[in-house]
């Protein structure tokens, strides 16, 4: 049985070095860290489902500026074959919904207001058997704009398969962030090994239909992305139960340190845990 590690990590392995970390794992400016979708724990949906989207964002060094969000949804225009991740001009796209973002109190980082997306009941109509079995993507775009003009954007693809399908993908469960094998609860005095503690069964096995109609067995590969407000990491992404070493340095006096982990299963499933008040 083949194991498929999330493509975004494979493509970035050349960048998983300390030289790149300040550009990615260090929290500072306005960022969308994850868009977690959920419907009863599932990360794979059926036509007509209403899906809850919970953004995880950070504006750690944003001061007192205010943030406005906007989102839109549409059938995926073909991102995997080069289309831009946008709903602009896509037939059947929803209207753009905007609103003020209530930023988390803790260092302006964490989960913010959930919004609901309704998947069209006709999304699978006219699709060929391979598309129906493997799933059709429903695209959700999400953007943020700060009162001083700073902007950022992200997107989420919701995998949609028939309601009769069994064994649909579920979100992984990131139970805890470990430091030296125990729960990270205090600011370390020196270098520690960080590890994501995912619940058993979070990496699921599934089948996918190939272009010739044959079935292929696969197993998800869990990838955890790490974010920090101080110190340095040796890796900003770890695979499965791999470790990254965190050298926190002296405890900062200008903010309360935090560490955030986001686990992805490569099929749209996401789980996030933040350790604050360290």
Enumerate the language-model features and the residues they cover.
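Solvent-exposed loop segments of extracellular immunoglobulin-like
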Residues: 63-70, 219-227
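Bacterial signal peptide processing site
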Residues: 17-21
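Surface-exposed, flexible coil segments in extracellular/virion-facing regions
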Residues: 70-127, 230-247
């Amino acid at each position: 049985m083949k194991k498929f590690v999330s493509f975004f990590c494979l493509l970035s392995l050349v960048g998983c070095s300390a030289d790149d970390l300040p550009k990615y794992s260090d929290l500072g400016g306005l960022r969308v860290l994850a868009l977690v979708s959920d419907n009863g724990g599932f990360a794979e949906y059926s036509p007509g489902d209403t899906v809850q989207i919970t953004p995880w964002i950070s504006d750690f060094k944003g001061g007192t500026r205010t943030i406005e969000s906007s989102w839109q949804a549409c059938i995926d225009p073909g991102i995997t074959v080069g289309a831009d991740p946008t709903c602009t001009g896509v037939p059947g796209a929803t209207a753009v919904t905007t609103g003020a973002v209530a930023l988390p109190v803790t260092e302006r980082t964490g989960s913010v207001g959930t919004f609901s997306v309704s998947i069209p009941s006709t999304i699978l109509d006219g699709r060929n058997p391979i598309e129906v079995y493997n799933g059709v993507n429903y695209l959700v775009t999400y953007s943020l704009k700060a009162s001083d003009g700073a902007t950022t954007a992200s997107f989420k693809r919701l995998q949609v398969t028939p309601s009769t399908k069994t064994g649909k993908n579920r979100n992984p469960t990131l139970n805890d962030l470990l430091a030296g094998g125990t729960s990270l609860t205090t600011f370390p005095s020196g270098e520690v090994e960080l590890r994501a503690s995912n619940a058993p069964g979070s990496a699921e096995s599934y089948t996918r239909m190939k272009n010739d109609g044959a079935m292929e067995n696969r197993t998800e590969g869990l990838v955890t992305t790490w974010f920090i407000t101080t110190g340095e990491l040796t890796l900003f992404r770890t695979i499965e139960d791999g470790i990254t070493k965190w050298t926190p340095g002296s405890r900062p006096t200008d903010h309360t340190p935090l560490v955030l982990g986001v686990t992805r299963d490569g099929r749209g499933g996401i789980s996030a845990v933040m350790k604050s008040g360290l």
